[in-house]
Amino acid sequence: MAQLCRHHINKWVTSEIILGVVFLVCGCAIYLLFRSKSLNLYQWCMLLGLSDSIDSLRYSVQHWNITEWVRYSLPDGLYCAAYILIIDAIWKNDNHLIKYIIISLVPIVTIGSEILQYLRLVKGTFDVYDLICYSIPPIIYLIYTYNSFMFNKLKTQSL
């Protein structure tokens, strides 16, 4: 039984890591294909000798009409989701407070900076779509964590 449970956890961890990497790659792809070449990510790809391939891809999608929020806000939400998934996978069997503090760092900083931009306390342009994209991953994670906790609590009580 314990081996079956361990196998289930390992599959879940693998799924979380794969999904986190997919979110990260999708966010990077949006940046590389639809954003300015002056961004650091493009410069890093240039150093790796990937600029010709990326330029070819950029040319092939140049007529795609994607919305502003997909171009500018969605990648950051995908990065936030990737961070949460990968950190949760790394600390899967640990339910200490430090795990949740570490998972909360990126969402708190991103949401906080967006709110501070709105209040004009930090430099930058407030964008409600950024705020939404930063907020959705931690909200989903909180709902998932709460439901898992309640399910495990009910399961233990019924034994």
Model-identified regions with their sequence ranges:
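Bulky hydrophobic segments
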Residues: 1-159
